[in-house]
A protein has these predicted regions:
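Nucleotide-activated chemistry modules centered on ATP-dependent adenylation/adenylyltransferase
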Residues: 1-229
């Protein structure tokens, strides 16, 4: 049985998929998809100023390896002052060589003024975190480095927007975002990590780690209540 939308998958199903990934995706299937994706990245970035967004999440870890194979070696990560200490330490140890850290500086004082952002109760509030940290940092990097395109690890299987009938689009602020993993399944991501023996940050070993994914600690979803969070 294949995994469905990320938000509707129980964390135990993720762990089962990780444990049995060889049965779901063969090395041959993965290698063919990898080669096609690297070719797609090359086709969209040749002769252009390009970089990739790295979040230390599982999708971006795969994205980074594919972009580097395609010759795109500049990258960035958006963080704030509310990251888990263990996650921040993992980023420093494992970030790509060409990765620039952009801190948007939301801190505990900011959180006190925006209590609705603590442990989001719905996807709309959770999406605001992505907007104010990752998307803002991407925009800053894009403009500062005068990029033509920034490459993201967004996938349709996560319910992410990747473009209308394509995997590339330009937003209202002039930032062109390209998502070469758009058609990759959850299983493809897990298989790439498994076959290439890639390390993952500690979040994935925590309770509901695959369900929540990487995030600043106040952005944690599915806590049930602020007290539980």
């Amino acid at each position: 049985m294949s995994l469905g939308r990320k938000q509707s998958i129980d964390n135990s199903a993720w762990l089962e998929a990780v444990a049995t990934i060889e049965n779901a995706v063969s090395r041959e299937e993965l290698d063919a998809l990898t080669a096609a994706t690297v070719a797609d990245i090359k086709a969209h970035t040749e002769g252009k100023a390009a970089a990739y967004a790295w979040s230390a999440g599982k999708d971006s870890i795969v994205l980074g390896k594919l972009c580097e194979a395609a010759g795109v070696t500049d990258s960035m990560i958006g963080v704030c002052d509310l990251e888990y200490p263990a996650f921040a330490a993992w980023i420093e140890e494992h970030k790509p060589a060409g990765c620039e850290v952009i801190n948007t500086h939301q801190n505990i004082d900011w959180l006190a003024k925006h209590p609705e952002m603590l442990f989001p109760a719905d996807s709309a509030a959770a999406g605001r975190w992505f907007s104010i940290v990752q998307h803002r940092a991407q925009r800053i990097y894009f403009k500062t480095h005068k990029l033509d395109v920034i490459i993201l690890g967004r996938r349709r299987a996560d319910g992410n927007y990747v473009g209308r009938n394509s995997n590339i689009y330009t937003d209202g602020k002039g930032v062109t975002r390209f998502s070469p993993l758009a058609a990759w399944s959850h299983e493809h991501i897990l298989a790439f990590i498994y076959y290439h023996k890639l390390p993952l940050p500690p979040i994935y070993g925590w309770k509901n780690g695959y369900l929540c994914g990487t995030h600043p600690w106040p952005a944690r979803q599915w806590t049930g209540s602020i007290e539980n969070g």
